[in-house]
């Protein structure tokens, strides 16, 4: 929505980036996920680094794209509380993956993703609910969506 050009590719990554790939959207969503629900709280969570008109337009676009919902909690002046929709909540795994990637590859690591019980870093794994098994990375394949129906069981 915000990029001057949209990715035209028939690719989940490209189409997801068309929705959340601008400079601010993921940070706004992460702020909401972290409990910052009002405009002022979201703005402050971004340390005032975003122009207010840009934040307003991003919030409207994220709502139009079905990632957040708004609830009017004050009429004069109108003020909204923002919450994640189920589609927005599904980005939590993306945020966690970015934290893990950052811990491994950034020169300065700011956050870690840990298991609360033992305080050690976790790893990501893939699970097949059909087979009820953890799946190794070398056993994964990305296939065209229509091919999903033709896979053997």
Predicted segment positions?
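N-terminal helix-turn-helix DNA-binding core of bacterial DNA-binding proteins
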Residues: 13-54
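Basic, amphipathic "hinge/linker" alpha-helix immediately C-terminal to the N-terminal HTH DNA-binding motif
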Residues: 21, 74-96
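Alpha-helical linker/hinge and terminal dimerization helices associated
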Residues: 26, 65, 94-105
């Amino acid at each position: 929505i915000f990029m001057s050009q949209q990715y035209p590719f028939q690719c989940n990554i490209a189409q997801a980036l068309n929705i959340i790939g601008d400079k601010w959207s993921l940070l706004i969503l992460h702020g909401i996920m972290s409990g910052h629900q009002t405009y002022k709280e979201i703005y402050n969570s971004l340390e005032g680094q975003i122009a207010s008109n840009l934040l307003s337009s991003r919030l409207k676009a994220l709502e139009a794209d079905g990632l957040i919902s708004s609830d009017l909690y004050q009429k004069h002046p109108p003020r909204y509380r923002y919450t994640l929709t189920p589609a927005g909540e599904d980005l939590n795994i993306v945020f966690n993956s970015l934290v893990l990637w950052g811990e491994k590859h950034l020169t300065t690591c700011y956050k870690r993703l840990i298991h609360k019980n033992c305080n050690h870093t976790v790893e990501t794994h893939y699970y097949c609910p059909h087979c009820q098994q953890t799946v190794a990375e070398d056993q994964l394949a990305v296939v065209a969506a229509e091919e999903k129906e033709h896979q053997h069981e």
